Amino acid sequence: MKQLLFTLLVILSFSNCTAQKPSYEDEIKLVQYELNTQYADTDKSPLTKEDLKSFKALEFFNIDKNYRIEASFELTPNTPIFEMQTTTDRLPLYRKYGIARFTLNGKELALSIYQNQKLMENIEYEDYLFIPFNDTTNGSSSYGGGRYIDINMPSEGSTTVVIDFNKAYNPYCAYNGKYSCPIPPSENKLAVAILAGVKAYGKHH
C-alpha cells in the first residue's frame, strides 16, 4: 500500500506543479492507481485471501496513446436482447447497443458494444456500456479469457466513440474462480495484439 500511495503522490505533485491539464500518461496512471487500490482493499478485492496477503500491484503494459482509439460509431437500434454466455450457468441479458469501427496496426477492426439490461435500470449505470474483447495476446501476456472496457454512452447523434485499451481490465475470474464472468462474444475477437491495459495475473506476482 505504501508503494501505491507513493505513486499517487508523485502523480498529484506533478499535476499541482503545472498549470496545465494533467497529461494523458498521468490520467492513465491514476486509473491504474485506483484499480490497484481497489485490489488491495480487503473489502473490495476480487483476489483470494491467500493472494491478497502478498499482493503489491497489478502488472500493466506500457502506456501507449496509440491504443486510445477514436472509432467511428454506428447505433444498432432494435437489436434483440440476448443471453450472454458466462463462465458459469448464469446468463445475463444484454443488447447490442452499437458497433465501433477503427484501424489499428494497419488492420480494419470492429467491436460490438453492449448494454446490460439490468444495469440500465440503475440510475448510476444508465449510460454504462460494456466492451468485452479477445486479442492475440490472450493466454500469454494477457488473461486467456479476454478483457473488458467500460465506456459511457455517446452523446445523441454522435458518430464517434473513444475506446481506450490502456483502460482495459481483467474479468474477476482472472483472479478468483468463484466469480461468474461474461465471455466475450466471438464477434469481438480481434486479430491483433492489444499491448495495452492490464496484463495476465499470476505469472510474475
Feature map (PLM): residue ranges:
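Intrinsic-disorder/low-complexity, polar/charged segments enriched in Ser/Thr/Lys/Arg/Asp/Glu/Gln
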Residues: 66-68, 97-99, 160-162, 189
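Mid-length scaffold segments of soluble, non-membrane domains
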Residues: 77-145
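Short, surface-exposed linear segments at secondary-structure transitions and domain or protein termini
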Residues: 118-126, 151-160, 202
